[in-house]
């Protein structure tokens, strides 16, 4: 008897295993969103805990979590740090796995108040769910005196994370600014003033006084960074508006033009004179006097330092990050002060000779500043035009560097010239494709010609108009990574296009996830994307042919041969 039961169990297991082995490759093995991201909440007076139990093999996007109160006031919601996840289309993003607990402090809630929670996630296997929205009913909460102003979850964190420069760049920029024609010749004079004209100070004493001077200058710059970052944080949403981004890009361009020598940008001469007189009244050689001199020097901007400093300040305002703001300006001042410290200790023998090269350093920083408006405009004009602007900047910079290097007499500069010329030729490729239409022609040849639909009625009408032909419906969204992989790798394949030559191709873009999109997905019983459906000539779907998840061109071609009606 026991042997028969054991044999029966083996047969049942074998059946399930073979069913899994020979299951359709496109059949869905993904769970509904509520099972992938089990959401729950618990409120205790002012304290509300939102929890997500995330199924193994799935993850939530940190930047897609939004919390909106209705008839309630909540404190600032601090999203915990996630783990970094990278894909080829969206780059690095922070995600949550396993479990997420999000505490929310409710300052006040009226009767009938609610909290709308929106989130979105994907599966590691290449399947993304539409944004999920949950409504959390709130118990009535009376405001207390300590209640803070209501704010919403910061939604601009992804912009901060994507800023193109780190604080270390500020240190390098500060060092570079030290070698511009407005700054470098002043260092011997500043060194003498800092030491109070005393030539017999010990090396340690001279280094200490110079360090104190640099710290005074750094204090001024750090304070500027903190103030600007705090102001940027208050107006963070406004600073992301397209008109504001365009305005900032124009300002950055003007700052770069000043570095090219088109005009001079500096503080009014009367203010500079007043600050200089204040500095001269300080006693050189004493720590207190030297510190004040450095702090005042931070306010006296020369024509060579005004534009880079203004660019960094505007950059910090965009970030709204006070730690970044203070840190960048501190490192910027430290970079400017390092050559001064070396000159004070070792003398002028370390100081390079003045010459035209200092103007070239200033011009090079103009190109660095020009990178910032392109970074800002990419959010407005898109990746394609952004690439063209980067191409134009690269051609301009490498072309200028090549022409400048022709003045050099040393033999090894010929190698540098060849490298610069090659870099310019590589940089011009996106502009060449744009001018001669190569990219457009390639896209025309490699992309399927889909007919777009939006609603259930439009789908039904398209099925009727197919007139007996088989129909393929592709459900697409910008937030679906695998959908973009389908476009780039699968739909561009000649074998796939040939197999679909006699098929009516429909596509529904559900990026907005509005009411019509939700209704369409519900009508088709679609859990997430990518999902591709196949209909026969009578407009009836073939459920066994449905594709969920990514397929490469070879697998999809085989699926079309085996499954398509």
Curated annotation (Swiss-Prot):
Q: Tell me where on the tree of life, at the top rank, the source sits.
A: Bacteria
Q: List the disulfide bonds.
A: 122-128, 182-304, 480-483
Instruction: State the signal peptide span.
Output: 1-19
What does the record say about its membrane topology?
A: Multi-pass membrane protein
Q: What does this protein do?
A: Required to facilitate the formation of correct disulfide bonds in some periplasmic proteins and for the assembly of the periplasmic c-type cytochromes. Acts by transferring electrons from cytoplasmic thioredoxin to the periplasm. This transfer involves a cascade of disulfide bond formation and reduction steps.
PANTHER family with a match to the protein in the record: THIOL:DISULFIDE INTERCHANGE PROTEIN DSBD
Name of the protein: Thiol:disulfide interchange protein DsbD
Species of origin: Shigella sonnei (strain Ss046)
| Origin organism lineage | Bacteria, Pseudomonadati, Pseudomonadota, Gammaproteobacteria, Enterobacterales
State the encoding gene: dsbD
């Amino acid at each position: 008897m026991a042997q028969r039961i054991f044999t029966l169990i083996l047969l049942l297991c074998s059946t399930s295993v073979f069913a899994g082995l020979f299951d359709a490759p496109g059949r869905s093995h993904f769970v509904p969103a509520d099972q992938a991201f089990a959401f729950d909440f618990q409120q205790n007076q002012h304290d509300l805990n939102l929890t997500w139990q995330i199924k193994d093999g799935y993850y939530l996007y940190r930047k897609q979590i939004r919390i909106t109160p209705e008839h309630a006031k909540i404190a600032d919601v601090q999203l915990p740090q996630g783990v970094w996840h990278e894909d080829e289309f969206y780059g690095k993003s922070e995600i949550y796995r396993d479990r997420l607990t999000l505490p929310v402090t409710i300052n006040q809630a009226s009767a009938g108040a609610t909290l709308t929670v929106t989130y979105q996630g994907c599966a590691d296997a290449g399947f993304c769910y539409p944004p999920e929205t949950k409504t959390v009913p709130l118990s009535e909460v009376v405001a207390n005196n300590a209640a803070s102003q209501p704010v919403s979850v910061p939604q601009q964190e992804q912009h901060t994370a994507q800023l193109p420069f780190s604080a270390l760049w500020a240190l390098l920029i500060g060092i570079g600014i030290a070698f511009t024609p407005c700054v470098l010749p002043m260092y011997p004079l500043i060194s003498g003033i800092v030491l109070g004209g005393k030539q017999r100070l010990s090396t340690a004493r001279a280094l200490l006084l110079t360090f104190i001077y640099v710290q005074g200058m750094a204090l001024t710059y750090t304070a500027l960074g903190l103030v600007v970052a705090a102001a940027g944080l208050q107006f963070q949403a406004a600073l992301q508006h397209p008109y504001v981004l365009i305005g900032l890009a124009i300002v950055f361009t003007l700052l770069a033009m000043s570095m090219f020598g088109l005009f001079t940008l500096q503080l009014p001469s009367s203010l500079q004179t007043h600050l200089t007189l204040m500095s001269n009244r300080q006693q050189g050689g004493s720590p207190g006097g030297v510190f004040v001199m450095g702090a005042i020097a931070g306010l006296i901007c020369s024509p060579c330092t005004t534009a880079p400093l203004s660019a960094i300040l505007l950059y910090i305002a965009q970030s709204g990050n006070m730690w970044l703001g203070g840190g960048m300006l501190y490192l910027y001042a430290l970079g400017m002060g390092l050559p001064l410290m070396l000159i004070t200790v070792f003398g002028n023998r370390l100081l390079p000779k003045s010459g035209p090269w200092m103007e070239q350093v200033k011009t090079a920083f103009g190109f660095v500043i020009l990178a910032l408006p392109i970074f800002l405009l990419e959010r407005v004009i898109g990746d394609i035009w952004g690439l063209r602007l980067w191409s134009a900047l690269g051609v301009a910079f490498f072309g200028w560097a090549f022409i400048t290097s022709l003045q050099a007499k040393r033999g090894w500069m010929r190698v540098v010239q060849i490298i610069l010329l090659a870099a310019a030729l590589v940089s011009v490729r996106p502009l060449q494709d744009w001018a001669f239409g190569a990219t457009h022609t390639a896209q025309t040849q490699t992309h399927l010609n889909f007919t777009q639909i939006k609603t259930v009625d439009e789908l039904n009408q398209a099925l009727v108009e197919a007139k007996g032909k088989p129909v393929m419906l592709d459900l697409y969204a910008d937030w679906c990574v695998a959908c973009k992989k389908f476009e780039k790798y699968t739909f561009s394949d000649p074998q796939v296009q040939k197999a679909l030559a006699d098929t009516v191709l429909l596509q529904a873009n559900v990026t907005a996830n509005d009411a019509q999109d939700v209704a369409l997905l519900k009508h088709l019983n679609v859990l997430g994307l990518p999902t591709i459906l196949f209909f026969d000539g009578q407009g009836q779907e073939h459920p066994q042919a449905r594709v969920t998840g990514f397929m490469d061109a070879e697998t999809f071609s085989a699926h079309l041969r085996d499954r398509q009606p």
